[in-house]
């Protein structure tokens, strides 16, 4: 596995001198196909798109596109494609900076928090979390 910052291998990535990762490459094992994700950011260093390469050729297996953000920098939308077709169209809702709703186009999921700001309900994964007096997870 390797990460590229300043000198990306693929032209879809621009060199970044901000510390942003421009490419992530990996192989599942020796002699396996090289997979690479190339990342694109906006002027505020927020991820806007990804592109996938397999053995140097552009692939559209799994790609994130059209990320948008609110004024606080929270993700508002994210589209995920699989083999070129829209697979998930996520929309995120917040109260302040706490995620309260997530919609994937098929269903809406609710998130809840206790008065200390700890997430107590993850609607998408069906998790309920209980915290102790020290704000440490006690039960999931």
Mark where each language-model region is.
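Acidic/glycine-rich beta-solenoid
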Residues: 1-140
């Amino acid at each position: 596995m390797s990460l590229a910052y300043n000198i990306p291998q693929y032209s879809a990535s621009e060199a970044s001198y901000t510390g942003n990762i421009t490419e992530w490459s990996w192989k599942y094992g020796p002699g396996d196909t090289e997979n690479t994700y190339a990342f694109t950011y906006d002027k505020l260093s927020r991820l806007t798109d990804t592109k996938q390469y397999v053995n140097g050729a552009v692939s559209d297996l799994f790609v994130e596109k059209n990320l948008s953000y609110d004024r606080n920098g929270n993700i508002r939308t994210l589209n995920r494609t699989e083999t070129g077709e829209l697979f998930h169209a996520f929309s995120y809702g917040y109260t302040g900076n706490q995620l309260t709703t997530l919609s994937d186009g098929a269903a809406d999921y609710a998130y809840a928090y206790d008065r200390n700001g700890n997430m107590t309900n993850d609607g998408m994964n069906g998790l309920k979390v209980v915290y102790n007096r020290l704000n440490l997870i006690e039960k999931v």
